[in-house]
Amino acid sequence: ASDVYKRQEAESVVGGSCELESIFTEAELKSNELAIQQLNKEYNQIHKLDKTDIAISAIAGIVGAAVDILMVGIPQKGPEGLEAGTLSNFIRKKFDEAFPADEMEKLANSKESKVPFDAQDNRNTTIRVEGLSAYYHRLLSLGHDPLLGFVVGVFDILTGRMTTIDKTGKFVSQVMENYADRKESNIFAALAKQLAHFKSDITTSMGLPAPLMGVFNLFQFGSIGEYEQTVAEIVQGMYYEGYDFIHFCSMSIPVMITEVIVRISYAIKRINEGKRICDSIPFSLNREKHPKLATMLFIAHSGATAINAGKVYFTKNPMAINYPQWVAFAKYSYKQLKWGVVEKLSLIHISEPTRH
């Protein structure tokens, strides 16, 4: 009650419609306004790219795209197996050397790599999986996915199942009774078996698919190209023609080159501007520490992705799609959008005072 009385007494003396600005003089308000404008100007200057920053980003994107076009190329089936650009052929050769065919064949036939999700046709299934064959079983079985396999594949090994998304987009998880002896009861043994199976499959003629490639079997829509194919059919055709995990690794190199050029150039520029070396190392994308880096990477990967889109358009060949490049573009686009819409506004939580 005393608090209410005091408030009423204060309102009777001062009034009830006081504004914060009323406690400042006109000169102080003007000074505050100028200070806020200066802070906003300095803030924008810190985050604004200069000509050198833009040039670094553009060059990095162009170099990465050039490596993709000239050295990665498009895989094609030749007399000696899959062939593409110089870099792709080099990477594939290194995989073949690291995983020799005779050793991988022995591993594939050993119990340590036998998994329940490796059926190559429908003879041992209880629920039919459309498209299951020696050509497509690794694309359809999620246990063969280089990412999902560590979850779905390990689960299948522990439960004696095979989990698939078939060619028509139907999700099927079924117990493989004929492969009951391939189960493991220990999660570590299951993980070891999963890795052994990956190893045995990686250099086969129809090898491991690119990460998450099997999920595209769900995309039963679209009318693309001369044959009016769905997205799923396009991806299935890409896998058949050699768009596999090894090619994914080859395509990742131009993306890494773009990334490295931007980050190293950014660090050199920061050091030349007088920043400490430890403050210039561009590992973090924290905009408080490196205010321009994320934007530079976004521009670089946007440029490289635009060039790749042009490559796909002019060749009319989906095999020209650089999957890792589009993943990088999506990642940095999300970060840039989040920065522009949410984080930037929260950092600039300074508004000019209302003048009366």
Where in the sequence are the language-model features?
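Glycine-rich, hydrophobic membrane-spanning regions of integral membrane proteins that mediate transport
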Residues: 2-347, 351, 355
